[in-house]
């Protein structure tokens, strides 16, 4: 162990866990099990051996927390660990983790290889940085894996798979129309085999020590440290702050996904979120796991204006805002994926569920709608495979969900048949419109906008390779899909009636002549919800939303036909000289869905081809001259 060296110590502050600079010294605090012995281990930088071991005394103890203050402590000279009951313990509150610089590398059996580091005292130049403050009703959310997103992108000039590489993607996101990025776990976690006697890393499961890695990172982690192997430089703090600053300069917000398992202390989760918000200026969090208290986070003053996303929570515990546009809480909505995929593939009895999900937008919290995520098929694979193909995960294809609610359009896997390929392309266009024309927050899983595939693997948690990495060659191959998604995002943004701040009621409560939203079908003003029905018409009254210039939005009618035959929709009458004009048709291959030159108008009936979504917009027709009309 360490040589016998003396360092002056004092009783520290137990309220602040971890290693924190204080005056001219450093405060060390660690929580230990009852009746435990503990020491602080200090290492000289880049030294393989401990420099000194300083035992905590009973005088340092408050409850189960040992706290020690070392005056005149030079942070630049040292790294540290704790020793608890004879086992080396890397501080879960460490602001920097040393020894995990290369992703997936085994750390061996040396318990001193992984250790904690300190925050830098240098002031970072934020250059008048400001939170973009994207309200939920204007948010276009884009989720990605930091490493997998750029690892196979040949256009990246820097180190691929890093925060620095993501900076190069900002113009791409701006072109697509994205204004909020969500990062899958980007704090330090133990993706590969660990040293056998490192107590702090005991939660790595056995299967990740057998040649595979936990690529995603949904496990216990070091929640205060940016992941070192996601950095191109030796300065994780500066690199991550620079990434956030450049996002904000581009008007893009950043959401961090954080997973807290059952054994995690809810207070640790709270402190972690507060830290990332205050120190790194992160804009929000997608919180997962059983080790969190949603109520604790929702009622914290520091997080009161922070976007917080959960999969489940007690609605009555939400701290309500004065206006729907100010809401900060959101629910990730897997029900949307399940029901809308079933509607897309023409399952029975899905019309009522589809109508619910498309309109759902509560006043006190938002809903995040998506058709693909990391946990399941990609958008491309959803229309290419009926069954999971997870053999590469080395679990005999038993892992991953058996319920994918997918339809391969007649052939399992890639096909050269034109009819199959065209149907798949149409179904992907349909899926994106389902997400982008729903009232909730649309979420796109990175790469889906140009048909990225995982070859049917619906659980690529361990695939740090071409399966788990985004295939950027598909962007050129599927350029038309990218353009369609880009246009669909722009269409959503242009029409505020498609994303109002709060709930729509289905009544004309402002006496505008039409309800704010209404349901239709083969009969106007009537939705057929019988189990055999596979079509739905939704009309939005544009007078209930205003554009940035104060003008009323246009009324919009969306016809969903997922029958395998043509269907005739009866259109509601419009007042005055207005008629319906077709602006989007997912079956229009030549025009790539968007009908800019369309001149025909509709007033009574609309024929929609099989498995197609059509969007109509109310337009003013020229008034006929009365003298001419009398002839």
Residue ranges and their predicted role:
Residues 26-36, 519-572:
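Carbohydrate-binding surface patches
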Residues 1-25, 51-53, 60-143, 150-155:
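The feature marks proteins involved in alpha-glucan
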Residues 155-162, 193-249, 260-279, 392-413, ...:
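Aromatic- and acidic-residue-enriched carbohydrate-binding clefts of CAZyme catalytic domains
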Residues 173-212, 376, 384-388:
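Carboxylate/His-rich catalytic cores and anion/metal-binding grooves
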Residues 246-318:
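Active-site neighborhood of glycoside hydrolase catalytic domains
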Residues 107-113, 281, 294-451, 459-463, ...:
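Conserved alpha/beta catalytic core and glycan-binding cleft of carbohydrate-active enzymes
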Residues 32, 76, 596-631:
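C-terminal beta-strand-rich structural cap/linker in extracellular carbohydrate-active enzymes
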Residues 119-180, 184, 214-217, 222:
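An acidic-aromatic substrate-binding cleft motif
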């Amino acid at each position: 162990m360490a040589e016998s060296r003396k360092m002056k110590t004092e009783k520290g502050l137990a309220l602040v866990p971890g290693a924190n600079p204080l005056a001219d010294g450093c405060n060390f605090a660690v929580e230990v099990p009852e009746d435990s012995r503990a020491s602080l281990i200090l290492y000289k930088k880049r030294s393989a051996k401990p420099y000194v071991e300083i035992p905590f005394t009973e005088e340092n103890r408050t409850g189960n927390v040992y706290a020690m203050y070392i005056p005149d402590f030079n942070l630049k000279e040292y790294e540290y660990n704790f020793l608890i009951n004879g086992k080396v313990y890397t501080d879960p509150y460490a602001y920097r983790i040393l020894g995990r610089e290369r992703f997936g590398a085994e750390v061996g059996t040396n318990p001193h290889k992984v250790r904690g580091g300190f925050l830098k005292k240098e002031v970072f130049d934020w250059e008048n940085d400001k939170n973009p403050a994207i309200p939920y009703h204007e948010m276009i959310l884009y989720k990605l894996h930091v490493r997998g997103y750029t690892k196979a992108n040949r256009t990246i000039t820097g180190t691929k798979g890093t925060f620095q590489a993501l900076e190069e993607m900002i113009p791409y996101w701006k072109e697509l129309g994205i204004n909020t990025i969500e990062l899958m776990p980007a704090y330090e976690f133990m993706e590969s085999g660990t040293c056998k006697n490192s107590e702090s890393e005991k939660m790595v499961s056995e299967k990740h020590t057998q040649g595979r890695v936990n690529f995603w990172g949904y496990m216990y982690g070091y929640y205060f440290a940016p992941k070192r192997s996601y950095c191109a430089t030796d300065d994780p703090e500066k690199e991550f702050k620079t990434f956030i600053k450049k996002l904000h300069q581009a008007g893009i917000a950043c959401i961090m996904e954080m997973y807290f398992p059952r054994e995690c202390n809810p207070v640790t989760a709270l402190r972690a979120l507060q830290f990332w918000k205050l120190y790194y200026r992160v804009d929000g969090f997608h919180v997962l796991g059983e080790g969190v208290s949603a109520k604790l986070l929702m009622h914290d003053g520091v997080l009161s204006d922070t976007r917080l996303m959960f999969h489940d929570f007690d609605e009555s515990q939400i701290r309500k805002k004065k206006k729907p546009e100010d809401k900060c809480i959101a629910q990730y909505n897997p029900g949307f994926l399940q029901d809308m995929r079933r509607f897309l593939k023409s399952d029975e009895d899905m019309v009522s569920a589809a109508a619910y999900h498309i309109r759902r937008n509560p006043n006190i919290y938002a809903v995040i709608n998506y058709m693909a995520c990391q946990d399941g098929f990609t958008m491309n694979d959803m229309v290419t495979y009926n069954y999971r193909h997870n053999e590469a995960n080395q679990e005999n294809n038993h892992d991953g969900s058996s319920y994918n609610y997918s339809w391969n359009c007649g052939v399992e896997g890639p096909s050269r048949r034109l009819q199959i390929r065209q149907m798949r392309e149409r179904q992907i266009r349909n899926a994106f419109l389902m997400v982008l024309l729903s009232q909730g927050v649309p979420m796109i899983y990175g790469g889906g906008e140009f048909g990225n595939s995982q070859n049917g693997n619906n659980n690529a948690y361990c695939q740090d390779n071409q399966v788990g990495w985004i295939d950027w060659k598909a962007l050129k191959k599927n350029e038309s899909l990218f353009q369609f998604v880009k246009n669909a995002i722009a269409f959503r943004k242009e029409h505020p009636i498609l994303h109002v701040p709060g709930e729509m009621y289905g009544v004309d409560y402002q006496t505008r002549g039409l309800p704010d939203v209404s349901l239709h079908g083969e009969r106007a003003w009537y939705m057929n919800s019988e189990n055999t029905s596979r079509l739905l018409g939704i009309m939005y009254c544009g007078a209930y939303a205003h554009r940035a210039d104060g003008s009323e939005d246009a009324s919009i009618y969306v016809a969903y036909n997922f029958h395998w035959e043509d269907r005739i929709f009866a259109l509601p009458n419009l007042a005055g000289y207005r008629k319906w004009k077709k602006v989007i048709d997912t079956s229009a291959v030549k025009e790539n869905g968007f009908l800019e030159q369309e001149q025909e108008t509709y007033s009574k009936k609309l024929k929609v081809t099989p498995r197609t979504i059509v969007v109509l917009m109310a337009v003013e027709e020229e008034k006929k001259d009365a003298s001419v009309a009398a002839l």
